[in-house]
Amino acid sequence: MSLPILDQLEEKIKQAVETIQLLQLEVEELKEKNTTVEQEKETLRQEYEQLKSEQQSFQDRLRSLLGQIDNV
């Protein structure tokens, strides 16, 4: 192989390595974002369950009050 061909090959290899490194960084960033989103999802799920429970309590109290009104 001639020297220019080796230089071209070396340059292409360097570019490929740089691209791989950039993609690895991007993958790490996406993993971190995914972790954050999963945590937010879990927080929202817990909040939803709490609100659902509160709603059920309010409905039960309202039914009880309506029942008392009906008895009057």
Swiss-Prot record:
<keyword id="KW-0175">Coiled coil</keyword>
<comment type="similarity">
    <text>Belongs to the ZapB family.</text>
</comment>
<keyword id="KW-0132">Cell division</keyword>
<keyword id="KW-0963">Cytoplasm</keyword>
<dbReference type="GO" id="GO:0000917">
    <property type="term" value="P:division septum assembly"/>
</dbReference>
<comment type="function">
    <text>Non-essential, abundant cell division factor that is required for proper Z-ring formation. It is recruited early to the divisome by direct interaction with FtsZ, stimulating Z-ring assembly and thereby promoting cell division earlier in the cell cycle. Its recruitment to the Z-ring requires functional FtsA or ZipA.</text>
</comment>
<feature type="coiled-coil region">
    <location>
        <begin position="5"/>
        <end position="71"/>
    </location>
</feature>
<dbReference type="Pfam" id="PF06005">
    <property type="entry name" value="ZapB"/>
</dbReference>
<dbReference type="GO" id="GO:0043093">
    <property type="term" value="P:FtsZ-dependent cytokinesis"/>
</dbReference>
<keyword id="KW-0717">Septation</keyword>
<keyword id="KW-0131">Cell cycle</keyword>
<protein>
    <recommendedName>
        <fullName>Cell division protein ZapB</fullName>
    </recommendedName>
</protein>
<dbReference type="InterPro" id="IPR009252">
    <property type="entry name" value="Cell_div_ZapB"/>
</dbReference>
<dbReference type="GO" id="GO:0005737">
    <property type="term" value="C:cytoplasm"/>
</dbReference>
<comment type="subunit">
    <text>Homodimer. The ends of the coiled-coil dimer bind to each other, forming polymers. Interacts with FtsZ.</text>
</comment>
